Amino acid sequence: MVAISEFGLKIKNIEASTLFEYNIGVRDHYEYKDAMFTNSLFKDFLEENGLETYKGESTRDIICLEFHYGSRSYQQELEHLYKVATTAQKEYNKARIKNDKFLLEKAKNKQNKIKELLLFARKNRLKYQQLTKEQLRTKFYNEGVEVEYITRKRNGEIKKRETIRYKMLFRSTGKAKKGSCMFIRDELYEKAKDFLYMGIQLPEENAPLVEVSAYAPLVASGIVGRVKIDPKNILILKDVDRYFKTNIVSIETDENKQCIAKFIEDYELKNTLFDGQALIDTSIFPEWGNGYILLRHHFCKMAAFHANIQMFFKDYFGDKYETATVTDMFGNEHYVKDIELITTDNAVKWLKMDVSYDAWCEKVYENNCMFGIVKTAHESKLGNVQKMSYQMVNSLDIDIMEDVIKESALYVERLKTDDECFFDYLKKHSNFSNDHEVLLALCEHNPEFVRSSYFRARRSDIIKAYTLKMKSGELIQIADNLTVVGSPYAMLLYAATGKEESVDEDDTFFFEEGTIQCYTERFNSDEYLAFFRSPFNSKNNLTYLHNMYSKKMEKYFKFGKNIVAVNMIGTPFQDRNNGLVYGSV
């Protein structure tokens, strides 16, 4: 078992409605679960600035609140308890009919507890306050909240009471989806807020609250590692847009407000070539990284792909390499020999907050230039194959279904006839609720067990269950989940010159009628590939790719088998894939 402290600090995740009712005296406890304050640059900062921990494993200085329910009025509490009492009476009657002493005792205890709760509710009827979950959220956000911690002796006697007051700190995008929010101890609030906001002072009126709420928590993203990058060695360029014309089907509404599909010829589309991506030099790319790393810092997020930046610059500039310079979007000159990372303005959100380049660099220097690594690419647990979804299957023509199901049909046949294949399936799909590990252990203990009637019956049942899943759309294909990078060689050319027109000199990809050229080591050169966006919304997200190897791609990029580079110049790749974001940033 891996200790939780390896991934962060244990904190309390409290249901806000129960905490409110506890604080006003109408509950004897509040509901909570264990959660984790994950490793992050923000956690590093707090630990250096007064965060108190217990044995380096947990902290009370940070809590998470969830707002799933509102608080009850006295009448609502009575109705709830009467409903529970009715259910408890039914359980008691069933236990009495069965004459089960254990169930009878359990039912009696439940009824006695409900009686205690009814007496408690009547005694405190004037204390109840009915608030919706939205009202509770507003109250806690504006006023903060107190949490009482009780330490008990082994016999249950109260040893110590401690009350800590918290203020609302932030909601990350992930937390916002769940309706939860991070709160911090009062004494740490100002330091923590100043760190998250980079010291940005918001105006009293028309403050960009939505933007700040989205970008400030980036530095609090959970990380799996760190990489040191001098901000002055980061080349930030203005992103490049490329326009082209193609035929499209536009979904519109007519005068009767009915949805119609309208065919339009020579419609102008736009590709933002490097949106949210970066190239990182091999000299600082971590050894454990695989093709790319997802980076976070103050108001900054980017997918940084493994490249031989300095090798390219040496080849490009030749004898002038030592003195060659390029100018960034702020007018700063950089020696190309010093550049460790290349990105664009779309990756640095501090520009939207009117923060200067120098001010951001100073903030990066404050934590010794350490960038957080959120994730990297990794191999699929299914190996050489991947499962399709029913949406993917439904997007394909029925005429080709025989080819679509071919791999799955062959696999089912192998499960029936190949013991090693079946054992491998058991290993990959074993969990605490099935008997796969037991079957494997019995076969290992006695190989002849595979001939037993019990094993044959279980094998048949397991394969039948798998075929049912297969029929629901989970067909397997020789495929993989790949991370997308857009026209990376064009990005190198742009970095060498600082001129937008240089991207058009990219000769690693060319326009090809009916398909889009790409480069990935996962498949062979000159193979044609079906690209399904994830999540896959409709057949419009299906793209036909042509895998093309080139010496330049092999020389200047170390992507491995989990990255696919796609031609973004003059192709509808972004629009066909709903404005797909590179590297899942």
Q: What are these regions, as identified by a protein language model?
A:
Residues 1-584:
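Core mixed alpha/beta domains of very large multi-subunit molecular machines
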